[in-house]
Each structure stands twice: as structure tokens, then as C-alpha cells.
Amino acid sequence: MLFRSQAKAVSNYTNSILANMEATDEGYDEALLLDSQGFVSEGAGENVFVVKDGVIYTPDLSAGALNGITRNTVFHIAKDLGLEIVQKRITRDEIYIADELFFTGTAAEVTPIRELDRVEIGSGSRGPITEKIQNAFFDIVNGRNPKYAHWLTAV
């Protein structure tokens, strides 16, 4: 049974929990989920972004990806940095030949992905675009970017 992941709800995490259990049983840190047609959807609890030839790609929402807050934050960051983001259907093969790959999410924040299915992604380390996105993200969430101060609530 497939669950649509357009909202964070307990039932929607069932596939994610099962996928993550299977991934960790096989020695991986995280799972990458595909939609019912075999296109990349998201991680078990994160959105996924692919960098190829300087362009950032992410699955469009029709693939079942969650329209997450951190995902949308990355869209703002990319615009600020003059980087192009394209939402499209992404094949598993496109993941393997990516220059860079990263997850985003509330817990993941911006996390580089070094390999998938034991296939090294790009250089096997955090790439320059992922680094720019990650640094800008941490500047925002740590209050070092005044443009986004209105996003923060002091507690």
C-alpha cells in the first residue's frame, strides 16, 4: 500500500519507517523512496535535492514529496545565491550521476549525501553548492542573516 506524503501524519510515516528499517538492516544510514512509477520521491523523513552541472533539481510535488518548510527555505536560499532550482521527475539513474546530493528536513537540516547504494556521489564529499546552501541555512537559523530575522522566534 502506498501513502501520499502531502502532509505530516502518523499514517504517512508508515512507509518511511519501514523503508528506513530495511535500509538500516542492509547497512545504510537512510532510505530514498520512489513513487509508484519508480521516480524519486524523497528520503524516509527528508526532501532530496540533486545538483548537476550547477543546477539544483528536486522532485516535483506530484512525486509525493512533502512540501516541507526546510525544502521551501532552500528555494529562498538558492534564489538569494543566484542558483537555479528545477522541480521535475527524477530517475534513480539521475541520482547516481549527480555531482552533489543532499537531504533537507526539520531534523536533517541540510545534510550532504556521499553515496547511494554504495555508489559514490560526485567526489564523495560535500560539494560546493551543497556547502553554500548549508552555510546559508545555518546563518538563517542561527540569526546571522538579518534578511530572515522575521522567520525566527526567540524562546
Name each model feature, range by range.
Residues 1-155:
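Helix-start/capping segments and mature chain N-termini
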